[in-house]
Amino acid sequence: MISTNDFRTGLTIELDGEVYQVIEFQHVKPGKGSPFVRSKLRNLMTGAVIEKTFNAGEKVPKAHVDRREVQYLYNDGDNFYCMDMETYDQFPLTKEQFGDAINYVKENTNLWVLFFKDKVIGVELPNFVELKVIDTPPGIKGDTASGGSKPATLETGYVVQVPFFVEVGDVLQIDTRTGQYIKRV
């Protein structure tokens, strides 16, 4: 059990049999009444975000989430196969379990799979990945001054907005949290 006074961003707690991660929290001490903690929580199984208010000092059960490093190997259309980096066991993940990670991983990419009570609840990516541009319209000379952008298709099939100077074959750094172009590598 953990006190709501000890909430930190990223902490995982268990509510109603579900696992939630604390996204935001705020300790509030009103002039009248007892203090409370206002929090924003993400359900790690469904991805839904809820707002919940706790009394200050209230005890909630801490969720023990196991984070294992894996290497993405390949997919067969419906399943995404990964290998545990400690035991070298291979196991499949469904599209739903893999989530948005589909847009950012290529074969042999290392990532983390989150387990709760031996059940996969999510996939955690590195903050930045490097992907190659396979298709983008050519930039027109003089367009760079306007600071505009154009779409570029990456090797995973993901489409991202990039500056005009980016060309086919360039390797780009992409932020997996926002899905945005960071820089050309």
UniProtKB/Swiss-Prot annotation:
Keywords: Cytoplasm, Elongation factor, Protein biosynthesis. Involved in peptide bond synthesis. Stimulates efficient translation and peptide-bond synthesis on native or reconstituted 70S ribosomes in vitro. Probably functions indirectly by altering the affinity of the ribosome for aminoacyl-tRNA, thus increasing their reactivity as acceptors for peptidyl transferase. GO terms for cellular component: cytoplasm. Gene3D superfamilies: 2.30.30.30, Nucleic acid-binding proteins (2.40.50.140). The keyword Cytoplasm applies. The keyword Protein biosynthesis applies. The gene is efp. It is found in: Cytoplasm. The lineage of its organism: Bacteria, Bacillati, Bacillota, Clostridia, Thermoanaerobacterales. HAMAP family: EF_P. One of its GO terms (biological process) is peptide biosynthetic process. Belongs to the elongation factor P family. This is Elongation factor P. One of its GO terms (molecular function) is translation elongation factor activity. It comes from Carboxydothermus hydrogenoformans (strain ATCC BAA-161 / DSM 6008 / Z-2901). Pathway: Protein biosynthesis; polypeptide chain elongation. Pfam families: EFP (PF01132), EFP_N (PF08207), Elong-fact-P_C (PF09285).
